[in-house]
Amino acid sequence: MASIHLPIRQLVEFLLRTGSIDSRFAGFDRANEGARIHRKLQKVAGEGYQAEVFLSAEWEACGIAFTLEGRADGIFTDENGTVTIDEIKTTTVPYEEITEELNPCHWAQGMVYAAIFSSQQGLDALAVRLTYYQVDTDQIQRFTRQFSRQQLEQFLQQLLTQYAPWAQRQLDWDTRRSQSLAALQFPFAEYRPGQRALAGEVYRACRAGKSADRKGGTRVFCQAPTGIGKTMSALFPALKAMGEGCGAKLFYLTARNTTQAAAEDAVARLRSAQPGLALRSVTLTAKEKACLHPDAEGHPACLPEVCPFANGYYDRRKDALAALLDGSGSFSRAALADTARQFSVCPFELGLDLSEWCDVVIGDYNYLFDPVVHLKRFFDAAGDWLFLIDEAHNLPDRARAMYSAQFAKSSLTEAKRALGKGKSSLKTALTKADKVFLAARKACAQAAPRTGAEPAGETEPTQVSLLPAEAAPDFALPEPLYARDGTVFLQQLPAALPAALRAVHTPLQDWLEQNPDDPAHAQLLELYFALQDIARAADRYDSHFVTQLTARGSELELHLLCLDPAPFVDASLAAGRSAALFSATLTPPAFYRNVLGCADARAVALPSPFPPENLGLFCLPGISTRYRQREASVPAVADALAALAKGKTGNYLAFFPSYAYLQQVYEAFAARWPDIPTLVQQRSLDDAGRAEFLAQFGPHPANTLLGFAVMGGIFGEGVDLVGDRLIGCAIVGVGLPQVNPRQEMLRRYYEEQSGCGFDYAYRYPGMNKVLQAAGRVVRTPQDKGVVLLLDDRFAQPDTARLFPPHWQHIQYLPGTAALETALKGFWDT
């Protein structure tokens, strides 16, 4: 008999949930508050009250064996000797409007628990009690119903009978998928050099994950050069392993939309190579981009009275899902939008619901790693998941940002102003918090007086003195790690700051619930979100964080900065069976394993598949691009770029460590060589602007084009200009992050951890940007191109040791004349 695992809550909500999506404010931290209230009620329930009772049972319906699992809030025996299942719900519904029929799902959930418990305990009758806790008034309303064991079992049987067609659909699909994946062939005539090795590493990791310790699963880091075909090399073996029972679902997670498109293309290639392939894939798109009915400002307005796609969503979603599941199996943003319009449902929520029925889920890193927006339906507990983490070199900085938070004192002042005249508990709380932040601002300004020194970010990395200073008398700052120019860094978070903000939380929440139509609602809602972010970060705060306070005029900015995301990334990856993290630049591997919480993971580095003679690699070590030498370096850099561009007609890119330096060199270059066409990256570009820039780099150019871009920016990685669309690039400088106090905190932290502070904070991230930029050249075995390195530090051992093996033929040249000769020799061969 076929069997299927089915969480009880999923069963009930899928069948019985009705109504609309309604994102109006109702307390966005109700999950945590609800858990606290559950514990509170369970604690006072009495000695015989069993809390959080796990229930599991095998139940047959329509020829399917359902494995049902769930957790009853409480089980107790009442004064009449009747065993009672207690289902606790928190609600913002006014107390007088709480009725027995408030939500049929609540009764159904309790009744399913009761059916299982009565069957297993041999009880002829059972009671189900709904306990509603009104969070605004702390009032409790209880309803109790008596059921016979026969009634409960009949009810459960009816639910499973209703669900059986959906279960059978999934079982049939699983069988088709397994058979289809077993027959899946690599979609190209042959593997590129290195592809088979990468595929083997991913396959072995997925296979090992089947029997791995569920506390972490198996993990592998794979560095594979650009052009090897990493997307297919990771996706294909993971699907083969999944077809062998080594995973129920595959999550392909990326840092950028362009990489998501590559994953979609790889799935499409597999389908075209094997017609009839049974594989469902969905791409999750941010709500703002997926929304079909934004408000006047372009934001989603998820209210039933405003959005027709939100109104009645849960009444129509099963029809929309059925239509999709009967279709092609490829669910892109466009496909979801088409179905959403057809059935008048929200495409964003439809994508989330559809993901439960799909084999491959493609999306951003945040769907796994972000503590706020991660997919709770999958990752709140460990599951049989496979993770493919693309462009994993981006994950450390992204993860740090996800676990950090910031708050500005001015948001308190502006909130008070928005409330207008009159007294209220919210105004009182805002005033008190504002006073605490005012005292902290004064203490910060006194501890770190402004000196008018050189702006942060415009120096080279050197040892910054971290000197403690005296705090203001009315706010005791802990001993600073750093204090300069209005900015203080602290290891210890001053408890008074999060405490003052927490005191605002409840009255603000009450105000938002009671004043949904107030003109200030949107502004105060933003304040609420900021308070939530700070509260979450404060709850996580430990030795992996530092506190930054910055005083500017009347403003005080509070930042809780995650320096080391390792434990949080580790916990997220532990939700799955296996994880393969891959990129063209994971050098050195120990650095990435350590900062991503995978110190014991296997790491492999694959050689370049391309002939080394196809890459001309040259360096002019006579040029220094350090900040204090940049102005003097401009003529030499411009001369080197001219030599590069004149070496052969074609398209080139020059990458710079900052936009200001780029502008300096560009102006000098354009003035001296106006006959060479140029293109300059603008400071801010949207997707259309990016596409327009890249479109200038066409195939078979009749004239030379030199593009000026920022290293580490949108053109420094994820750009695939094959053939003669790009035949050379210059990399100006070693890519070190700009010096600022935050970067120095990273240096300090990792110096204490491993003695490698400069490497972890500066050298390794910088070299990553260099290698990514260089990887834009030579994308296929037939390509031929040049990489020119401009900086004396490329000749120093500490930097040169980070070069990949296929860079061993680098030529260090004494000047521009030698470069011209070397380029001629390269292009003539």
Regions found by a protein language model. Give the residues of each.
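Conserved RecA-like P-loop NTPase helicase motor core
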Residues: P621-A632, R683-F794
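A substrate-engagement module of RecA-like helicase motors
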Residues: S178, Q185, R214-K215, C246-V361, ...
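Signature of the SF2 helicase/ATPase Hel1-core->accessory helical subdomain module
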Residues: A234, A261, R341-V360, Y365-A499, ...
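A contiguous, basic/glycine-rich beta-loop/short-helix subdomain that forms a polymer-engagement track
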Residues: L336-V361, P371-F378, P507-S624, A632-V634, ...
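Metal-dependent nuclease catalytic cores that hydrolyze phosphodiester bonds in DNA/RNA
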Residues: M1-D78, T82
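Conserved helicase motor "Helicase C" RecA-like lobe of SF1/SF2 P-loop NTPases
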Residues: P657-Q682
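Conserved pre-motif I regulatory segment
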Residues: W173-Q223
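Mg2+/Mn2+-dependent nuclease catalytic core
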Residues: A57-Q154
